Regions:
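Histidine-acidic metal/acid-base catalytic patches
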Residues: 39, 56-60, 65-69, 76-84, ...
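Short beta-strand segments at enzyme active-site cores
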Residues: 46-50, 85-89, 186-192
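Active-site loops and adjacent core secondary-structure elements that bind or stabilize anionic groups
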Residues: 12
C-alpha cells in the first residue's frame, strides 16, 4: 500500500488560521493562501494539524450541531485545497498538558515534562500561574492567558459529563462529518489524550488499545482513523506501541514520533534515541515501516 509521510501544517503555518477561534469556519481564501505559500516552499499540503473541535461539540449541548455544520464547511474547504488528512483531538477544555515547559536537562537543553504530584489537589488556575512563572516564555495550547477567564465556566459545564457521554458526543460528531469526508476524500485522524489518563476530573477517551478499538467501532467508515503519537500513548507503560501499530496500522493516517522518559508518576520528553528514553524507537519505526 502506498504511504506518504505527512507533516502537520498547524505548526508550519500560523500567521492567519491559528487566530480563528475554535468553531469558526476556515475560509477557502485563507486555506488557499496557505496552500500557495506552502507549495512555493516546495512542500505539499496533505495533512492539517489541527482543526480544533469546539467545546459545545464535546459537551453535546444545544449548540453542537451549529458548530459541526461549521466544521463540515471547513472540511469542504480543506478538501478543495487537496488536504487528505485532518488531525484533531477530543480532549475536554485543554489540549496537551505539561507541568514544566522548560525543564533543565543538565546539558544545556530544556524539555517539556509532566509531574502528576504537581497537579494533585490544585485548580487549573493555580497550575496556570505556576506554569506561567516558569515557562521560559512558552505556552500550552488551550492554556493561553486569554482563556483563563472561561476555565471555571467550562469546568461547570463538564460537571457530570462521563466518559460514556463524551464517547457518544464523539460518535455524533463523526456520524455527521463522515459522509462529507468521504465525498471530499479526507481522513480524520484523532490525536490521543496527552497525558493518556484523566486530569482535573475531566473524562479522557483516547488513552489505550481498548479506547482505540471503541473509537473505530463508532462509525463504519475508513475516514475514522488515528494520529499515532508515540509520546502521548508512550507516557503510559501499559501501552505496547509496536503491537498497537500492528493492530491498528490500516487506520493510522498520521504519526508523531516522540520519545519520553517515564518515571513513577511523571515523564519528560527526550531525544529520539531509544537509549535516552523509555520507548524502543527502533521497533516503533520498524512497525510503521512494515505496514
Amino acid at each position: 500500500r502506498d504511504r506518504s509521510v505527512s507533516r502537520g501544517l498547524g505548526d508550519v503555518y500560523k500567521r492567519q488560521l491559528h487566530t480563528l477561534p475554535a468553531g469558526e469556519v476556515w475560509p477557502l481564501d485563507m486555506v488557499m493562501d496557505m496552500k500557495h505559500e506552502i507549495e512555493a516552499a516546495g512542500l505539499t499540503m496533505e495533512c492539517i494539524e489541527s482543526v480544533n473541535v469546539h467545546e459545545d461539540i464535546k459537551l453535546g449541548n444545544e449548540n453542537a450541531d451549529k458548530y459541526i455544520d461549521n466544521y463540515i464547511e471547513s472540511i469542504r474547504n480543506l478538501g478543495k485545497a487537496g488536504v487528505r488528512v485532518i488531525c484533531y483531538n477530543f480532549m475536554p477544555v485543554f489540549d496537551w498538558t505539561r507541568t514544566d515547559l522548560a525543564m533543565d536537562m543538565g546539558n544545556g537543553a530544556t524539555c517539556l515534562s509532566y509531574n502528576g504530584a504537581q497537579i494533585e489537589g490544585k485548580s487549573p488556575e493555580d497550575m496556570f500561574r505556576e506554569i506561567d512563572e516558569n515557562s521560559n516564555g512558552y505556552a500550552m495550547p488551550g492554556w493561553e492567558t486569554e482563556r483563563m477567564g472561561e476555565i471555571k465556566e467550562l469546568f461547570q459545564k463538564y460537571k457530570g459529563v462521563t466518559e460514556d457521554d463524551l464517547v457518544e458526543n464523539l460518535r455524533h460528531f463523526l456520524c455527521r462529518i463522515a459522509p462529507v469526508c468521504e465525498d471530499c476524500g479526507i481522513k480524520m485522524a484523532i490525536h490521543p489524550d496527552d497525558p493518556p489518563w484523566g486530569i482535573f476530573g475531566l473524562p479522557r477517551i483516547i488513552k489505550n488499545t481498548a479506547d482505540l478499538e471503541r473509537l473505530l467501532s463508532l462509525v463504519d467508515s475508513d475516514i475514522n482513523g488515528i494520529t499515532f503519537c508515540t509520546g502521548s500513548l508512550g507516557a503510559s507503560k501499559d501501552n505496547d506501541l509496536p503491537a498497537m501499530i500492528r493492530k491498528f496500522g490500516d487506520r493510522i493516517y498520521f504519526a508523531h514520533l516522540r520519545n519520553v522518559l517515564r518515571r513513577d508518576g511523571w515523564f519528560n520528553e527526550t531525544s529520539h534515541l531509544s537509549s535516552d528514553g523509555s520507548l524502543d524507537m527502533y521497533e516503533i519505526v520498524k512497525a510503521l515501516y512494515e505496514l
